[in-house]
Amino acid sequence: MRLIHIPALESNYIWLLADSNQHCVIVDPGEASPVESVLTYKGLLPQAILLTHHHQDHLGGVPQLLRRFPDIPVYGPKETNKKGATILLKEGDQLFICSQTFSVIEVPGHTLGHIAYYSAPYLFCGDTLFSAGCGRLFEGTADQMYDSIQKLIQLPDETLICAGHEYTLSNLKFARSILPDDPQIALYQKQAEQLKAKNQPTLPALLKLERQVNLFLRCKESFLQKKMGTHKHDPLSVFSTLREMKDRF
């Protein structure tokens, strides 16, 4: 399988997963033109579109793509029913496309109906989990987002996180403000800066590394709890406080 990232809009990534037969799956096409360009250049034929949630920057390209490829199915959560999805999905559903099995994981938080798709080793998680960060709580609660992330971190270390935005450097800047002396975060920030200087993506990110550099995955660590100065040492309170701090950062 070939994983292809397509920069779109201001900070989005659209993902393509292609097989040896030149067939591919399109994930979260926020706009159509860059997708069409890549499909033409690489000679790929889409077999399906996968949507993670209903925000326009993740599905704005669906109508134009369907005009060109009218027969391909569009999968998504219930909240995308009126946004182009033709087949609605829920927790536990499985899709078999391009010789790959995609498992559906419900991950409410960023939106109430947000889902992720896992096809080892790839995790297409939209705006739930970013490298060194997590999504804003536009509709859901901190409890929901925390539980969603707990689901995702049960996946194997070699999981590749294919997030919906290139937010890595800003997330690492926030992480350094909390843990300025953390060597892993400092090293990853340097590596991310080098990639940006070469106009290269920081994604996909390895889940094994995220366990070390993503504060939102480290809420059970007593060291982080003390560093934040929170008097509530339960992981959910730490997560909620971190999310509020990031919103103000």
From Swiss-Prot:
Cofactors? Zn(2+)
Organism of provenance: Hamiltonella defensa subsp. Acyrthosiphon pisum (strain 5AT)
Question: Has keyword Coiled coil?
Answer: no
Q: Which regions span the lipid bilayer?
A: none
Q: Which residues are noted in the entry as Zn(2+) 1-binding? A: 53, 55, 110, 127
The UniProt annotation places Zn(2+) 2 binding at 57-58, 127, 165
Q: Name one GO molecular function term.
A: hydroxyacylglutathione hydrolase activity
Q: Say what the protein does.
A: Thiolesterase that catalyzes the hydrolysis of S-D-lactoyl-glutathione to form glutathione and D-lactic acid.
Q: What is this protein called?
A: Hydroxyacylglutathione hydrolase
- This enzyme's EC code(s): 3.1.2.6
Assembly, per entry: Monomer.
As to how many cofactors bind and how, the note says: Binds 2 Zn(2+) ions per subunit.
The entry's keywords: Hydrolase, Metal-binding, Zinc
